[in-house]
Swiss-Prot record:
Protein name: Small ribosomal subunit protein uS2
GO cellular component: cytosolic small ribosomal subunit
InterPro entries to which the protein is assigned, alphabetical: Ribosomal_uS2 (IPR001865), Ribosomal_uS2_bac/mit/plastid (IPR005706), Ribosomal_uS2_flav_dom_sf (IPR023591)
Example of a GO MF term: structural constituent of ribosome
Organism from which the protein derives: Karelsulcia muelleri (strain GWSS)
Lineage: superkingdom: Bacteria
Cross-referenced Gene3D superfamilies: Glucose-6-phosphate isomerase like protein, domain 1, Helix hairpin bin
Amino acid sequence: MYNIEKFIKVGAHFGHTTSKWNPNMRKYIFMKKGGIHIIDISKTIKKINEACKFIKNIVSSGKKILFVATKKQAKDIVSDYAKKVNMPYITERWLGGILTNMSTIRQSVKKMNVIDRQKIDGTYNMMSKKEKLLIDRLKNKLKKNIGSISKMNSLPACVIIVDVKKEKIAVKECINLCIPIIGIVDTNCDPRNIDYPIPANDDSSKSIHLIISYLTNSILTN
C-alpha cells in the first residue's frame, strides 16, 4: 500500500533548514543534508498507518472528522478531498471559538438561513439594490468563513490539520476540548500535543496531496 519512492518523488522527506528545526522532531529526522533536515520516511509511513486505523474506527461509528488547512498550497487539496468523503472542512481563516464556542457559529448559521428564507419567500426581491448588495455581501462573508461546518451539529470526533504550527489556534481549541488531532508536522513543528503526528513536508502541495489521499482513502474503504 505504501511506497517509499512515492514519498521521495513528491519531496515529503524535505524538512526545513536546520536553523528552523524544533528539537522535539529529533526522532523523526533521518539526517542533515545541504543545511536541510531530511525526514525519516519510514516513520512517516508508520504514522500514516496508525492514523488511518484510528480514522477507520471513527468512521465506523458514524462520527465526523473535521479537515483544517488554510495555507495556500493546501486549501484546494483539502477541500476537494473533504467533499469527496462528505466531511466538514475549514480552508479559510480559522475563527477563534469555532470549536470552543459553537454557539457563536450557530448564530452565524441562523443568519445564513434567514437570508436563504428571504430569497425563497420573496422578501429579498422587495429590497432596494443597496439592501440586496449588503445582504449578498453578508451571505458571501458568512459562507466563506463558515463553509461546510454550517451543517456540523456537534463537535468532530477528530480533526485533521495540515501544518500544526500555522493552525496553532485550532490545535489549542482541540486540546482544550480533548479532541484527537491528526497533524502533518514538518521539522519546525512541535509534535508533542498531536495525538497522531505525521512527519512530512507540509509546504509541498504534492506531499500534502499524497498524505491526505491516504487519510481520506481510509474513510472510503471503511
